[in-house]
UniProtKB/Swiss-Prot annotation:
Belongs to the universal ribosomal protein uL6 family. One of its GO terms (biological process) is cytoplasmic translation. GO terms for cellular component: cytosolic large ribosomal subunit. The lineage of its organism: Bacteria, Bacillati, Mycoplasmatota, Mollicutes, Mycoplasmataceae. PROSITE patterns: RIBOSOMAL_L6_1 (PS00525). One of its GO terms (molecular function) is rRNA binding. It holds the Pfam family Ribosomal_L6. The gene is rplF. InterPro entries: Ribosomal_uL6-like, Ribosomal_uL6-like_a/b-dom_sf, Ribosomal_uL6_a/b-dom, Ribosomal_uL6_bac-type, Ribosomal_uL6_CS. NCBIfam families: L6_bact. It comes from Mycoplasma capricolum subsp. capricolum (strain California kid / ATCC 27343 / NCTC 10154). This protein binds to the 23S rRNA, and is important in its secondary structure. It is located near the subunit interface in the base of the L7/L12 stalk, and near the tRNA binding site of the peptidyltransferase center. This is Large ribosomal subunit protein uL6. Part of the 50S ribosomal subunit. Keywords: Ribonucleoprotein, Ribosomal protein, RNA-binding, rRNA-binding.
Length: 180
């Protein structure tokens, strides 16, 4: 059985946590502010620079929510104090990316350039024409934006062309063996 919900979450210095009556948690830090509504089955308290989550009953669904709530709160605390970053690499002849204002222009071997609208709360930098850095305070949003960009041209297993995460390893396949 997982005991993630029983962890005490340390509130970093410079981070302020407010809990409204309807379990609306607002966390403010040096990087920004995040708010999220949590289930009324989980009680959230602040005691001596620690966040404590308690479940109100022992049903299976409530136990699942307990661990999920704890993990989401930890992500919010990390996001407003340190932020999150995902890095993408673009591999392929002529494949490149450029940031123009609030749009990301991708050349991925299609007959047309791909334009990606950068959502609010996320910053995308083209470190090189073949490397992207996606940063923000919302863990879910940063990961979703990275996944959406990667989905335009997933890495293929024969030559490895496409968009991949920086530390991702692509399992390569051997091409067809030549016949007689």
């Amino acid at each position: 059985m997982s005991r993630i919900g029983n962890r005490l979450l340390q509130i970093p210095n410079g981070v302020e946590v407010k809990i409204a009556e309807n379990n609306l948690v607002t966390i403010t830090g040096s990087k920004g502010t995040l708010s999220k509504q949590f289930s009324p089955l989980i009680k959230i308290e602040v005691e001596e620079n620690k966040l404590i989550t308690k479940r109100l009953n022992e049903q299976k669904h409530t136990k699942q929510l307990h661990g999920t709530t704890n993990s989401l709160l930890q992500g919010m605390l990390t996001g407003v104090s340190e932020g999150f970053k995902k890095e993408l690499q673009i591999t392929g002849v002529g494949y490149k990316a450029a940031v123009n204002g609030s749009k990301l222009n991708l050349s991925l071997g299609y007959s047309h350039p791909v334009e990606f609208e950068i959502p609010d709360g996320v910053v995308i930098q083209a470190v090189k024409p073949t490397e992207l850095a996606i940063t923000g305070i919302d863990k879910q949003l940063v990961g979703q934006v990275a996944a959406n960009i990667r989905a335009y041209r997933k890495p293929e297993p024969y030559k490895g062309k496409g968009i991949k995460y920086k530390n991702e390893t692509i399992i390569r396949k051997e091409g067809k063996a030549a016949g007689k």
